């Protein structure tokens, strides 16, 4: 039996207006009925990242290396010895990302993997990726038949999102590994005017916008527990949150994770964004802190703090987090997101609201939220802290 997938129409360009995530049917692929890709890994999605403090310590050593540019933010930005037809200097903007499976369906995992790789380019206000490479590990824990099918489906899903982003996969590397792995490299050659650097423009009074809800890590774990019950599920979740609520949460989260941030990249430039980052493995507060810290270096350093006042979260993820004593730190702002939204700074509430309205109109009706502001950092601020949750911050349940 063939495993048919919905095809995007020619007019679709952003990954939000295609059909909803199809229900995973392993048997239709020739896999055992009980097959789940997440059985072959213990770490999921962007939660596999090295803890942020350890990573930043390593990056400090790397940043001291002569010739390194923009180390530590979402993309590498390297000046080229070429100009465009207008005589403007060109830059190679590149990024790489990969992770272990977070969902059961290998095709969907490929889609999410590609969307996540592209997101770093999009956080630079670059909507057009020139080329992608695919990085893939096939699991040695599967039998040969399962390995062939899952690898094929992951590659198909990755390539489908690349096509939706109007780019192509031109190379990569495939290896064997106990845990499956999917990711890649995204590259674009642009002029200064064609990107929004994450540093240099941010200032006190800027308004912060988030383009996707939070709670994906909670969603994928609840889904796995629904299929493979754990003691925590039995103790804290069963009897409090229904299987139907978990399925709804999972479907909302996977639709969000596979949705491209491409339109957000295009519109942030149009509406005069001062900078952005994407929210992934360190959680929104971790990435906001990194964004704020990046302003304190460079030619015009600023000591700023990003204040998060209201956060959109999947409602069932909020309920589950409260039942589990916030095991994944969603309510603290540190829950890992996979292929999360863009956190964008705008010079005014008017610009931020216009961005949100237009993005909803062109991105399949998906909302964005004004979530906070930028302020001058207190002179007695704790060393290394450049972002905070406002006391009693508002949770917007989605």
From Swiss-Prot:
Keyword Transferase attached: yes
Top EC class, one word: transferase
Reactions the enzyme catalyzes: hydrogenselenide + ATP + H2O = selenophosphate + AMP + phosphate + 2 H(+)
TM stretches of this protein: none
InterPro entries tied to this protein: PurM-like_C_dom (IPR010918), PurM-like_C_sf (IPR036676), PurM-like_N (IPR016188), PurM-like_N_sf (IPR036921), SPS/SelD (IPR004536)
Top-level division of the source organism's lineage: Eukaryota
Active site: 46
Binding site for ATP: 49, 72-74, 97, 120, 171-174
Site positions for Important for catalytic activity: 49
GO BP terms, alphabetized: selenocysteine biosynthetic process
EC number: 2.7.9.3
A Gene Ontology cellular-component term: cytoplasm
Similarity comment: family membership: Belongs to the selenophosphate synthase 1 family. Class I subfamily.
Described function: Synthesizes selenophosphate from selenide and ATP.
Subunit structure: Homodimer.
Protein name (database record): Selenide, water dikinase
UniProt gene name: SPS2
